[in-house]
Amino acid sequence: MPDSNAQGSREKESGHHRSHKERIGNYVVGAEIGRGSFATVYKGYRSKTRVPIAIKAVSRQKLTSKLLENLESEINILKVINHRNIVALTDCFKNDTHIYLVMEYCSGSDLSVYIKQRGNIPTLDFVPKAGSSMALLPTDDEGKIYWPHPPTGGLDERVTRSFLGQLAQAIKFLRAQDLMHRDIKPQNLLLQPATETEVAEGHPYGIPVLKVADFGFARILPAAAMAETLCGSPLYMAPEILRYEKYDAKADLWSVGAVLFEMSVGRPPFRANNHVELLRRIEKSNDNIVFPDEKERDSKSSDETSIPVPSDIKALIRALLKRKPNDRMGFDDFFNCGVWDGHMAESTEEESLSLDVSTDSSAGLGESDRIRQMVASTEQSKDRLIPTRAPQPLAADAALNPQPAVPISRDTSEGRSRLSTPPSRPTPTRRSTPKYYVGDATPSEPTAIIPPSPSSAPTPTSAPDPGLTTQQSPTSRANPRPIITAASSAQRRMSGKGDGREASSVEEAAPITPPFAGPSPTMARPSRGINEGSPLAAAPPITMGPDGRLERSSALEGSTSGVGTDYVVVEKQTVEINALADELDQASKRPMIRRSSRGSVVSRPVSSFKPISPNIAKNDPTLGPISYSPPFALSSTPPFAMQVPRHASGGNSFPRNPSIPSSLNAFPPTTISASPSYGQDAAARFGVSPGSLQTGALARALTNTAIRLIGTSANTAATAIARATAKRRPNIVRVSDMDAAEDDLLCTVEDLARKAFVLFELADERLLAQTQLAQTARTSSTPTGLTGTTPPFSMQAAAAAQAGSRRKSSSSSMNSEVWILRQQEAAANDAVVLYMKSLAFIVKAMDKVKRYWKNRTDVYDGYVASQELNEMGQWLRARFNETFEKAEWAKTQAGDTLLFPDWLVHDKARDTSRQAAVAELQGDLTTAEQGYETSLWLLQALLDESVYENGSIPDEDKVAYDRLMVPIKTRLDALRKKLAESSGMTAR
């Protein structure tokens, strides 16, 4: 609670009792108007002028280095661009818990609400011109008139064309800066009533101004460059993104086509519950886009018909919604299509309405001051010459960009004149310097980033694809001005070996002091596995290149040894593994007698290792098949293993382990083992029969995604899968229960599965450590009295009450917080890489099963899989799906430096063998056996050359691992003799 002195000072300053507004700099914070996963948006106003603004409050506690990179991307983009159809960034602030973006306030909501409300948004009313047919429109209860839209279907054609033209202007401007938005959707297209100046300059009267917002996913992407991350909203995603393929700026054109379809029809072109189903529907359409009026015409229905979509808009939508990017309309053709010609400026001709209007409701017009001003402005604009201005791509704000703006040269190519560049909005007068900086030390003054020399630019480690040679953008553009940051002199870490560093927007943190005593496994981490900086020290994705153009720099691009983009989990692998497991399940015969041993160092069958998830009863009618599709990018929801109830339904579907819960949580599954014990919880973690495995029955739709997990994988199994699943299962009994080829296969696959399993367990431990550190950071950074539903703004009273203690411990507490964040990121990095290595072993094993199955089905018609082979396939499928989801979630918490923690696996093997020895001394022989086995599996995984980036293990490491395995094997053999003797005595 605020103390009396603070309360009294606030009352004195405010001038009235119990009246206080939260403030951020020179801005007063008002009511909440929006909320997302990582940010809350509030409406506010300038304290002196009372001009409305929007304040986007982003919680620093939720920001991993990846999310911070997205935020810095948005900040740096908005700071250097100035366009009437792009939401403006006014100012930036930060405190210990939040980063605040003060942005232009758009009072007309967004396009999705506009479509849903048919334009009836309170702030978008207008007064028709004198003598216009719109003056005959009916008014609402408050005497307001809104733009007339059809009662169903899409928007009025004139509004659709105007909105499309405004969106095209924004996209053309972004193209001039080599920017792609990557998340164009109706929710990110904000609306604002046209100002007097905009109406005077020719903006269509009564039609709102459209502004593109939310650049959190935007990135620099030259014309020929390709991206490969999953960003954006599924319903408006291009199919190449849904297929996890590389994509270029043409992905934005698909999104534009989807938005245009929704404006014209009233709904998205494709709808589905998840992106796998969405991709299936897009592929099924085969580029055949059918509009509602065409369906009604073909069916010759006598019911009420839909509003027809103009033919030129239909043609444009079909040209944009092409599945293959090469077949999709290009930017030049899009800008020259002419669909919005005549609808970007006010027409002097009389409007013609296609709707029936009443003639008795013109009263109540012009009641508000704003409406009267609009009428006056319209009358004055009749005799006013519409000014023309050179386009200004960059803000002329001296505080944000001290250098003079350089206008973009006009494009002189044929046909480009159709898309007129709108005049820049008036530059606001800034009376204060920018407040944004992410570093923890307040700088004395802002400094400009100096463009790096060519020699300082990071060199990619891999040669570029010849087919993807970067070309100069055909659109002429000015050199952007330097981005201003308060800590621009700081250096960014490099993820590769050596001491090379990149420029950063943040300052280096002070020396770090651990917040608590005691050894930590991450403190002894070699330098090659640690990011030399806080997660808050991620460099902004936009920097200045040697030629003055905007560039995107990433630690991964300069890495020589990190995992980086070589490991991209793809949906196609998930589909193939699930499909093959389903086929094996369908083609299995009655259970066989399992061979007792394959001569391996391990006695436990691999089938006993079930997924670490609660068992789900197969006969439970309230549970349904849960998709194992990877979670959408930037999702903070971890892959929980929880039962998801549903209504009972028919069919032959069997439940799978759930993947994503209905409730959101920022932490990964609670089923992760909290300790590496092998005693009492062994029975709970390790199943005892194949029946405990979850079997799936829904084969996934096969996509055309390029496989990037461990290189290219054979796709020849697809034909065999389709052929085998189409046959009836014949009643064939195998002559012999022993198949030498299958026995060799299972021996090899089991060894791979064991390696995958132990790496998965170790990854779970690291992910658990990450969540515990996250909880520690959340607890330590939440001040008393500021929890619960308190808005995330700095409260003067609480700050005054705690000022003394803060001044004494601010340095140590900040260092502790940064230390926790670094350890949290390091744990997530380890988890991601270990999950990926585990997935690599699983995929390798499944490929062997796939090749074996194809050979058998090609030679023997109606070949029946053994129960053992089916059991192995189900285990691999279940483990792949669980590992896949956890890797996707851990990736959102990880940083840029992703190196294989071989030292961690080695230390884990040694510790586990020690624990096993202690258990043996205490007489717990079963637990000791499991510990020795696990230790050997870990060392065998280290001896597998496939886990290393260069494909070979260092000789000295191989010798060390072999030397360590000898005594463990000796102990295991002796222990098994004891177990055999004890079992023999028990039998007697």
UniProtKB/Swiss-Prot annotation:
Residues noted as binding ATP in the record, renumbered to the chain: I33, G34, R35, G36, S37, F38, A39, T40, V41, K56
Keyword Kinase annotated: yes
Annotated catalysed reactions: L-seryl-[protein] + ATP = O-phospho-L-seryl-[protein] + ADP + H(+); L-threonyl-[protein] + ATP = O-phospho-L-threonyl-[protein] + ADP + H(+)
Pfam families linked to this entry: ATG1-like_MIT1 (PF12063), ATG1-like_MIT2 (PF21127), PK_Tyr_Ser-Thr (PF07714)
Compositional bias annotation for Pro residues: 449-463
Subcellular location: Cytoplasm; Preautophagosomal structure membrane
Keywords: ATP-binding, Autophagy, Cytoplasm, Kinase, Membrane, Nucleotide-binding, Protein transport, Serine/threonine-protein kinase, Transferase, Transport
Membrane topology recorded in Swiss-Prot or TrEMBL: Peripheral membrane protein
InterPro entries the UniProt entry points to: Atg1-like (IPR045269), ATG1-like_MIT2 (IPR048941), Atg1-like_tMIT (IPR022708), Kinase-like_dom_sf (IPR011009), Prot_kinase_dom (IPR000719), Protein_kinase_ATP_BS (IPR017441), Ser-Thr/Tyr_kinase_cat_dom (IPR001245), Ser/Thr_kinase_AS (IPR008271)
UniProt cross-references to CDD domains, sorted A to Z: STKc_ATG1_ULK_like
Gene3D superfamilies: Phosphorylase Kinase, domain 1 (3.30.200.20), Transferase(Phosphotransferase) domain 1 (1.10.510.10)
GO molecular function term, any single one: protein serine kinase activity
GO terms of biological process kind: autophagosome assembly; mitophagy; piecemeal microautophagy of the nucleus; protein transport; regulation of autophagy; response to starvation; reticulophagy
Record: active site: D183 (proton acceptor)
Any GO CC annotation of this UniProt entry: phagophore assembly site
Compositionally biased intervals (Polar residues): 468-478
Chain segments carrying region Disordered: 1-21, 394-561
Top-level lineage group: Eukaryota
Main EC class the enzyme belongs to: transferase
Entry's family note: Belongs to the protein kinase superfamily. Ser/Thr protein kinase family. APG1/unc-51/ULK1 subfamily.
Subunit structure: Homodimer. Forms a ternary complex with ATG13 and ATG17.
Protein name in UniProt: Serine/threonine-protein kinase ATG1
Organism, scientific name: Cryptococcus neoformans var. neoformans serotype D (strain JEC21 / ATCC MYA-565)
Encoding gene per record: ATG1
